[in-house]
A protein has these predicted regions:
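Glycine-rich flexible loops
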Residues: 1-270
């Protein structure tokens, strides 16, 4: 077995283990069929001088746009065509560490293997670029296909601004507490398209989690577990709603007054 970038770097290993753990949850929840979904995490804070000196193990690859705040940043990215269930067991065989070059428009792979990152890397990196610009502290992006949330996106009634947010908040107090910005919605666009990436970036100005109509969700978080937790909580609310409907009744949900009380009690932004 060859040497890994994780050897002797416990903090970095712990971060990659966290990514692997979340990949396992995505698979176990049925949200990551075949090679569905992506994870990209900014690991620059764990990079030492020895890592900075590592040579490239790939050719220089274009990002597709210039992202001025990513100069010299390092990311762990799930590989294109790789499965979450495999990422959960063998993260360094199913993802790679990349370095953004000084032109802010290209990158190289530096470890462990020359696993080509996801084709959705440009859209993930654009979100990371914006988070650094804002100084938000967000380090992780996750794209996955939560069953109940995608199912609800097939009904146009739910796609108006904050319609789903209000419904999901009202199903269980934790949703409003732990997803206080709610759920943004991006109308259907071709997967992997520039339009989808731009619309997602715009919607993430106001939300931490965005629903892609008839496709999946895209979330940003302080780390990969934070991004997962928000998706998980929203999905629980969606399941409660759909279970109520399956039992033949419309759930009453928490009242506006009860949700306002939550906002006051926990100093929530909305």
């Amino acid at each position: 077995m060859g040497k890994s970038i994780l050897d002797g770097r416990q903090a970095l290993r712990k971060e990659i283990d966290k990514i692997a753990e979340v990949a396992g949850y995505l698979w176990q929840n049925g949200w990551a069929e075949r090679n569905g979904g992506n994870i990209t995490v900014n690991i620059t804070e764990f990079v030492d001088d020895a890592i900075k000196a590592l040579p490239a193990i790939s050719e220089v690859r274009p990002i597709g746009e210039t992202l001025p705040h990513l100069k010299g940043q390092y990311f762990f990215c799930k590989g294109t065509g790789k499965r979450m269930r495999d990422l959960a067991r063998w993260p360094m065989d199913n993802g790679s560490v990349i370095r953004i070059l000084d032109d802010c428009a290209s990158y190289v792979i530096i470890a462990d293997h020359a696993v080509q990152p996801t084709s959705e890397l440009p859209s993930h990196l654009a979100v990371h670029d914006r988070q650094i610009e804002l100084g938000s502290g967000y380090k992780a992006t996750v794209h996955t296909h939560p069953i109940e949330l995608v199912a609800m996106s097939h009904n146009n009634h739910f796609l108006g601004k904050d319609v789903l947010t209000k419904i999901l908040w009202s199903m269980i107090p934790e949703t409003k507490a732990f997803c206080p910005l709610g759920l943004g919605v991006v109308p259907y666009q071709l997967p992997g398209s520039v339009k989808l990436a731009h619309d997602t970036l715009s919607e993430l100005e106001d939300y931490d989690v965005v629903l892609w109509e008839k496709h999946g969700v895209f979330a940003k978080g302080t780390d990969v577990m934070d991004a997962f937790d928000q998706i998980d909580v929203l999905s629980k609310s969606a399941k409660i709603y759909l279970d109520c409907k399956a039992m033949g009744y419309e759930p009453t949900g928490m009242s506006d007054e009860q949700m306002a009380e939550m906002s006051r009690a926990f100093n929530l932004p909305r």
